[in-house]
Swiss-Prot record:
In tubers and floral buds of untreated plants. After abscisic acid (ABA) treatment or mechanical wounding is mostly accumulated in leaves, to a lesser extent in stems, but not in roots. Its main location: plastid. This is Leucine aminopeptidase, chloroplastic. It holds the Pfam family Peptidase_M17. Mn(2+) 1 binds at K342, D347, D367, E429. The gene is LAP. It comes from Solanum tuberosum (Potato).
Length: 573
């Protein structure tokens, strides 16, 4: 690979769970229970090593390759852009940075000096390509000694999303050129405070790390990106910026885990596989994280009838209830919180089977996107180790399948707080599993809860594929999460909790039904979950059905990990 020298460019099946369909429903006139459980041990052949290195047979004999997360040396440097040496230089420029003088020369000092070294090639190329610095624009210059990429940042680069996009564009150019050493710089840092520069460097690093990552575990042949080092130029140096970049690396590792969990098919990531991944996280960070995995029999003892009702039909892959706890040795504790993730490793819809092209049943492996975000956050926090906060990570993992033992439309299940639910739609199963998970979280004595779930298609209709819906009765918690999401560059929008809609969720024979009319479906879904949260606990529900998956890239996004980690840190000492 040639080295870019800006100053001289022109010179050179096992046992399983069986239970009767109406799990944990007790008729008032008949106190009899009828259960028959036979539970696969957690370390059975089907769930021995999870996601990163599966051992044992799976349906289709698929065995993924090792995870190939990027290993990049990242540093903040004060090297002059014009003097930097490497394979590819990416420069982020706003529309103002591209302004020209009367002689069609750049007014921006950095672009002016760079263009002078290149004998006007930069200005000529930007004119020829009609590059004006608009968001989404980019041009690539192939030069004898390497490449230069100009990336548009729009009218102003004032958000982490802009710098994240710059990093992603740099990563795309690096992959195309198979570059080993790249640098990223801003054309201008005018108006950026010292803190903003640090945050910008972190966002750029995040964009490069996530942009360079490719999930090739299920490809018979793949090309590993060549990128080895990233220099971030002109945004400062020193311990603070290096610490922020290291933080970004830890968060990206969590995001990549989240992506891999969602990308992996349901014949690889089963409920047992998620449980094993949780055990792996606890083992890796045993100084701060403990794990407790409950099997079906233990969940039965806790009267988790809503969760077990959903899981009843999955005779090949029994449910596992996952509870990780993060706690440092510090005696000081600011707050105690819980992160709850929906963990449906596959959702067929049950007897209300998903049918037709619009059902996207082939993508129902992503119905555990909430669980993936929670486990990704656990991994990141295990590395970061914030002080003074206790975090409970909770996932009720199971499959929603069809069998003679399965839950039927019209069945009534009883949650662990005693509330009864008439199941009028077996495809509204996630909220049933979350009901028992939220009750369990409240029983841990937490003060705040965030749950994440691919809960409704209605939220995608309302907000589109890129924005999550946030539901909470707490204005204070809403502000906390919105600020954390903005700092992380993830998009969410607070939605109303219209209490009058609850009337449509009332049952004639039980306390409630599990799904209401089509209109306002995302709201009634959130109102349903609210029935299982203690009134004294602050709670926020994130419906991530849209941003969990990118149709354009045909890949998981890892949505939620960054926001969760940022929110936890803001609740720490």
């Amino acid at each position: 690979m040639a080295t870019l020298r800006v100053s001289s460019l022109l010179a050179s099946s096992p046992s399983s769970l069986h239970c009767n369909p109406s799990v944990f429903t007790k008729c008032q006139s008949s106190p009899r229970w009828a259960f028959s459980f036979s539970v696969t041990p957690l370390c059975s052949r089907r769930s021995k090593r999870i996601v990163h290195c599966i051992a044992g047979d799976t349906l289709g004999l698929t065995r993924p390759n090792e995870s190939d997360a990027p290993k990049i040396s990242i540093g903040a440097k004060d090297t002059d852009v014009v003097q930097w040496q490497g394979d590819l230089l990416a420069i982020g420029a706003t529309e103002n940075d591209l302004a020209r003088d009367d002689n069609s020369k750049f007014k921006n000092p950095l672009l002016q000096r760079l263009d002078s070294k290149l004998n006007g090639l930069l200005s000529a190329a930007s004119s020829e390509e009609d590059f004006s610095g608009k968001s989404g624009q980019s041009i690539n210059l192939r030069l004898p000694g390497g490449r230069i990429t100009l990336v548009g940042l729009g009218s102003s680069a004032s958000s982490p999303t802009s710098y994240h996009s710059l990093g992603e564009a740099a990563a795309a150019a690096a992959k195309s050129a198979q570059a080993r050493n790249i640098a990223v710089s801003l054309a201008s840092t005018d108006g950026l405070s010292a803190e903003s520069k640090i945050n910008s460097a972190s966002a750029i690093a995040t964009g490069v790390m996530l942009g360079i990552f490719e999930d090739n575990r299920f490809r018979s042949e793949s090309k590993t990106p060549a990128l080895e080092s990233l220099d971030i130029l002109g945004l400062g140096t020193g311990p603070e910026i290096e610490s922020k970049i290291k933080y970004a690396e830890h968060v990206c590792a969590g995001v990549i885990l989240g992506r891999e969990l969602v990308n992996a098919p349901a014949n690889i990531v089963t409920p047992g596989a998620l449980a094993e991944e949780a055990k792996k996280i606890a083992s890796t960070y045993s100084d701060v994280i403990t794990v407790n995995i409950l099997d079906a029999e233990q969940c039965k003892e806790l009267k988790m009838g809503a969760y077990l009702g959903v899981a009843a039909a999955a005779t090949e892959n029994p449910p596992y209830f996952i509870h990780l706890c993060f706690k440092t040795n510090s005696r000081e504790r600011k707050t105690k919180i819980a992160l709850v993730g929906k963990g449906l490793t596959f959702d067929s819809g049950g007897y209300n089977l998903k049918t037709g092209a619009g059902s996207k049943i082939e993508l129902m492996k992503n119905d555990m996107g909430g669980a993936a975000a929670v486990l990704g956050a656990a991994k990141a926090l295990g590395e970061i180790k914030p002080r003074g906060v206790e975090v409970h990570f909770i996932v009720a993992a199971c499959e929603n399948m069809i069998s003679g033992a399965g839950m039927r439309p019209g069945d009534i299940v009883t949650a662990s707080n005693g509330k009864t639910i008439e199941v009028n739609n077996t495809d509204a199963e996630g909220r049933l599993t979350l009901a028992d998970a939220l009750i369990y979280a409240c029983n841990q004595g937490v003060e705040k809860i965030i749950d994440l779930a691919t809960l409704t298609g209605a939220i995608v209709t309302a907000l589109g594929p890129s924005v999550a819906g946030a539901f909470t009765p707490s204005d204070g918690l809403a502000r906390e999460v919105v600020v954390a999401a903005e700092a992380s560059g993830e998009k969410l929008w607070r939605m109303p909790m219209e209490e009058s809609y609850w009337e449509s969720m009332k049952s004639g024979v039980a306390d409630m039904i599990n799904t209401g009319p089509r209109d306002g479906g995302a709201i009634t879904g959130a109102l349903f979950l609210k029935q299982f949260v203690d009134e004294k606990v602050q709670w926020l529900h994130l419906d991530i059905a849209g941003p969990v998956w990118s149709d354009e890239k045909k890949n998981a996004t890892g949505y939620g990990v960054s926001t969760l980690v940022e929110w936890v840190l803001r609740n720490s000492l």
